[in-house]
Amino acid sequence: MKNFINIRDISAKNLRKIIFDAKLRKNKRKKLNALDVDKDNPLRGKLLVQMFEKSSTRTRLSFYLAIRQLGGGALNLRADELHFAKGESLPDTAKILSTYGNAFMLRTDSDHKLEEFKKHMTIPIINGLSPSSHPTQVLSDVFTIEEIKKKPISKLQICWIGDPNNNVINSLIEASVKFSFKLIIGCPKKYYPNKNLLIWVKKNKGKIKIFNDCKKAARLSDVIFTDKVVSMNDKTNKFKKLKDFKNFQVTSKIMNCAKKNAIFLHCLPRGSEVTNDVFFGSQSRVFQQALNRIYVQKSILLYCFEKLR
């Protein structure tokens, strides 16, 4: 049994195995419908219990399809539907979920809660998003980049424009170390990545640079990422933050600073951090990016069940 909580906790070798398996499985589904089961049916009869404390579109749908295509089934729960929301202890809830299900995916508003579920569960647990991390999204993004660019991400320059301290960029920073790629962050002054994460990056010889000018950050990059400036976990002054980031919108001028064949990625949902012409433009790959979550999450599930080929 293995868990999938943070990218930094998983070896580069196992992360690469997940991506390799996802590529094989995607190639074998070209003539199959969304609910058709993979021929090897590796998780036949397995139940994935999903609990959502926060709203979800792509994570909910992609994990549902992932477990179905592997031969299993999914049960979606909201915390407020359970006795857990009305006083039943977390350890008791974890034991019950472990009794009924074979794996547990949690989308939560608390990193502490995620760790407590991990401590008390006897089945694999997957982080479907927490305040500090979104590992399933970012591993899927690495897959998408390599699929489009047809080369290892270690040979590419990745640029992030926007908030340098949210769950997606945290996982992207961790991935930059595990996959050895150059990561450039463009953000306003007085905004910085998580300090403890930067210490970990330095200790592991990561390749990260920070610019307070988004044109300089985007220069000669192969991929431009962004995300909502005000995320689901933000407790800061919304209007002040939007004002601080007004010059860090991804526009066609920013894309023109990157390489001619650069692509644009966004985990969604979007706000004002990207213009429509970029989002719907020829360099945007956001819908391919969203689709690929199914395939990578299938391989994450197999990793957790120790059934990776």
Give a label for each model feature.
Residues F280-R309:
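C-terminal helix-to-coil terminal segments
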Residues L70, Y100, H120-T122, F179, ...:
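Short, structured coil segments at secondary-structure junctions
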Residues M1-L61, L65:
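Positively charged, low-complexity intrinsically disordered leader regions
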Residues E53-L65, E147-T226:
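Glycine-rich phosphate/diphosphate-binding loop of Rossmann-like nucleotide-binding domains
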Residues K202-V278, Q283-S284:
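Rossmann-like adenosine-cofactor binding region
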Residues L47-Y100:
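Active-site cofactor/substrate anionic-group-binding motifs, chiefly glycine-
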Residues K30-L32, K95, N102-A175, H266:
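Anion-binding alpha/beta catalytic cores of soluble intermediary-metabolism enzymes, centered on
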